[in-house]
């Protein structure tokens, strides 16, 4: 099996490292030599040089693993970006058509393709068919469209990747921060696109007690509140009634109960100390209020469209410099009290200069921006504030908080001398919650616990065997229908086949 990096075509937008360095030199710029990437158009392997003899009547076909978002020539080539099918523009179709045409009478099979339903995005694509960043409904729709584009290109067949989500996989954008790497099979990282391709989901936790972001209290039964206010409950938006924490193999879950949700009158900050009370920022943003524990992160809840997770600058993983993702070594939290926090910006696509001497800018996005929605509406839901109950629920992927292995309670704490990635066991997390009026941020508000009280440590049990359960994603039925339509078969049956009584596969889950 081949892949686009070794295809027999030539791509004018894809310079090699050596070619790109020369182009930078002509411009008087110095290229960042620390970029780790393949030369994606240096050598080609052409299946056409082989032919079957009469002793091999079955013949030969060319097989490619071809995804729509990588290498960069898939998204940058000007001719590919002019291509379209009756359904609309498709740079992917443009590439496939050239690839299939090159092979002439030799059949071409796209033996891997698809997009993952991960929160994290590892590479951007112009039609929105990114390497991650899709909810499960979008994954189904995109996988179906890619299948039709493969068919339209004249390819002889297509094999969708993959049957199930794979917790053990790793992706270039997060691999350095899944540490120890041999333990990443013990937890699900929603930031890791490679782990979430399946048409059958491998969910974290036990099915019967799985958490859902819905603004309701039913899945919090049995969870004792970390903080509770002694004040008489009221409908005052600034009132903080209680704060609770739970977790599973994929997420940290937070529940904040307030008097009433009214974003014009009350915003909320949740300071999060992930390692050592004496490290991190000892002040909140906006309000300037002091804390007796340092925050590595602050949840900034300002309404459905503008809430995000912020990070203390010394602990930010990256700096984006001239379109390059530069590691912010030594990846260590530092004591400070300036109340300044960064957005969590990442660069899935770096800046490039093509062989055509065209400058292609980087693509960056704010990983910390939170999606406000019910989980029943989108599997990318990060949080939901229920205006009726006053319950605010948030889930944060462990990797968002620089937890490199939740199963061993390991958090990022780099080597001060070498600047290399390293981890350290934390005793748990500490949380401080503050409400404030956005019209007068330094005015009155409430706080849990109060400023004079000690901040307790919340912790979780380590594990050597993960809890999980399987669920069928929308792509399962969508792809059943799509393949049937392209093959001219009768309409595919529903997930339960009434004629045979069979059901989609049910995987054996761990006994609890």
Residue ranges with predicted function:
Residues 11-51, 176-193, 321-360:
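Charged, glycine/proline-rich intrinsically disordered loops and linkers
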């Amino acid at each position: 099996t081949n892949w686009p990096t070794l295809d027999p075509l030539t791509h004018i937008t894809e310079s090699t490292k050596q070619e790109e360095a020369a182009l930078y030199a002509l411009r008087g710029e110095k290229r960042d030599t620390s970029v780790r990437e393949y030369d994606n158009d240096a050598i080609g392997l052409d299946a056409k040089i082989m032919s079957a003899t009469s002793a091999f009547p079955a013949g030969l076909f060319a097989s490619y693993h071809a995804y729509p978002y990588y290498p960069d020539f898939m998204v940058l080539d000007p001719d590919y970006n002019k291509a379209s099918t009756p359904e609309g523009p498709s740079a992917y179709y443009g590439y496939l058509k050239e690839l299939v045409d090159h092979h002439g009478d030799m059949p071409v099979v796209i033996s891997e393709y698809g997009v993952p339903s991960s929160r994290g995005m590892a590479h951007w694509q112009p039609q929105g068919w990114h390497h991650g960043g899709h909810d499960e409904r979008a994954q189904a729709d995109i996988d179906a469209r890619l299948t039709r584009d493969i068919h339209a290109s004249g390819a002889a067949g297509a094999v969708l990747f993959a049957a199930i989500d794979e917790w053990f996989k790793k992706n270039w954008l997060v691999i350095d921060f899944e540490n120890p790497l041999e333990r990443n099979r013990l937890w699900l990282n929603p930031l890791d696109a490679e782990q979430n391709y399946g048409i059958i989901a491998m969910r974290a936790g036990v099915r019967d007690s799985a958490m859902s972001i819905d603004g309701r209290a039913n899945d919090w039964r049995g969870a004792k509140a970390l903080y509770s206010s002694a004040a008489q409950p009221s409908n005052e938006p600034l009132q903080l009634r209680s704060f609770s924490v739970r977790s599973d193999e994929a997420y940290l879950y937070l529940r904040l109960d307030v008097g009433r949700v009214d974003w014009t009158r009350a915003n909320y900050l949740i300071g999060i100390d992930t390692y050592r009370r004496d490290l991190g920022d000892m002040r909140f943003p906006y309000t300037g209020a002091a804390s007796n524990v340092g925050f590595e992160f602050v949840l900034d809840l300002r309404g459905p469209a503008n809430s995000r997770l912020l990070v203390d600058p010394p602990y930010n993983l990256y700096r984006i410099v001239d379109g390059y993702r530069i590691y912010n070594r030594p990846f260590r939290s530092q004591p400070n009290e300036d109340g300044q926090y960064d957005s969590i910006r990442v660069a899935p696509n770096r800046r490039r200069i093509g062989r055509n001497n065209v400058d292609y800018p980087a693509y960056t996005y704010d990983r910390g921006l939170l999606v406000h929605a019910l989980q029943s509406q989108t599997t990318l839901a990060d949080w939901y504030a229920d205006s009726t109950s006053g319950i605010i629920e948030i889930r944060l992927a462990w990797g968002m908080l620089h937890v490199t292995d939740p199963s061993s309670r390991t958090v990022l704490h780099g080597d001060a001398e070498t600047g290399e990635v390293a981890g350290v066991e934390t005793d748990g997390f500490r949380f401080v919650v503050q409400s404030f009026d956005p019209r007068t941020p330094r005015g009155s508000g409430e706080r849990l616990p109060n400023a004079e009280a000690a901040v307790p440590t919340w912790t979780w049990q380590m594990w050597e065997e993960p809890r999980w359960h399987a669920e069928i994603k929308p792509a399962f039925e969508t792809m059943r229908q799509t393949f049937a339509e392209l093959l001219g078969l009768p309409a595919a049956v529903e997930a339960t086949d009434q004629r045979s009584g069979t059901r989609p596969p049910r995987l054996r889950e761990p006994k609890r």
